[in-house]
From Swiss-Prot:
Protein name (database record): Pyridoxine/pyridoxamine 5'-phosphate oxidase
Family, as annotated: Belongs to the pyridoxamine 5'-phosphate oxidase family.
E.C. code: 1.4.3.5
Lineage: Bacteria, Pseudomonadati, Pseudomonadota, Gammaproteobacteria, Pseudomonadales
Reactions it catalyzes: pyridoxamine 5'-phosphate + O2 + H2O = pyridoxal 5'-phosphate + H2O2 + NH4(+); pyridoxine 5'-phosphate + O2 = pyridoxal 5'-phosphate + H2O2
Broad class of enzyme this protein falls into: oxidoreductase
Length: 215
């Protein structure tokens, strides 16, 4: 390593975030920022990639990168195996946090709230538009469980392909969506000298309240 970690930094000077720019509803601002990210971010960055943090029954945190697959006025939707580690964690503690980071825009969004399963109909609707390989994978992979090796996984895939050789796979009961119902959404815009802009929205008594946080 030619540069020490202590010396690795960059200054953020692209933009600012003033209250005058921020709507009263955080979903409006998220849609604006997400549209900017879709137009601006380039591979390997995926605009809908986010870090999802969960907490297990023993209070230990876990995080991983997932893809956002749905957004409406209710909340933010992602899909997974309900029997996976994250599914078990959400069953034990149905609260989570998401973080989106768009480096080209020098922006970050943090979202916190309760998580609930979406309807079976909504899960099936998304499942049916996935590529065939992904639909088969939802049946084949015992997500988060220990397996002997890659060969075992490939064997499970072949068995699943044979099972559905004459029919289209349907959405398994152990697979589906979760929706995070936000209680807090923070918008972060990088600024020079680490004096970043942070606008925080809190859902209180059925209404969104906006406040500025110190960087």
């Amino acid at each position: 390593m030619t540069q020490s970690l202590a010396d690795m930094r960059r200054d953020y000077t692209r933009d600012g975030l003033a209250e005058a720019q921020a709507p009263g509803e955080p979903f409006v601002l998220f849609h604006q920022w997400f549209a900017d990210a879709v137009k601006t971010e380039q591979a390997p960055v995926e605009a809908n990639a986010m870090t999802l943090a969960t907490v297990d029954g023993e209070g230990r945190p876990h995080c991983r990168v997932l893809l956002l697959k749905g957004l409406d006025e209710q909340g933010f939707t992602f899909f997974t195996n309900y029997e996976s580690a994250k599914g078990q964690q959400l069953q034990a503690n149905p609260f989570a946090a998401m973080t989106f980071f768009w480096p080209a825009l020098e922006r970050q969004v943090r979202i916190e709230g309760r998580v609930e399963k979406v309807s079976a109909q909504e899960s099936d609707a998304y499942y049916q538009v996935r590529p065939l390989g992904s639909r088969l994978g939802a049946w084949a992979s015992p997500q988060s469980r220990v397996i002997a090796g890659r060969e075992e996984l490939e064997g499970l895939v072949k068995a699943t392909e044979a099972r559905f050789s004459d029919t289209q796979p349907h959405c398994p009961e152990h697979w589906g969506g979760y929706r995070l119902l936000p209680e807090r959404i923070e918008f972060w815009q990088g600024r020079a000298s680490r004096l970043h802009d942070r606008l925080n929205y809190r859902f209180v008594n059925g209404q969104w309240q906006r406040e500025r946080l110190a960087p």
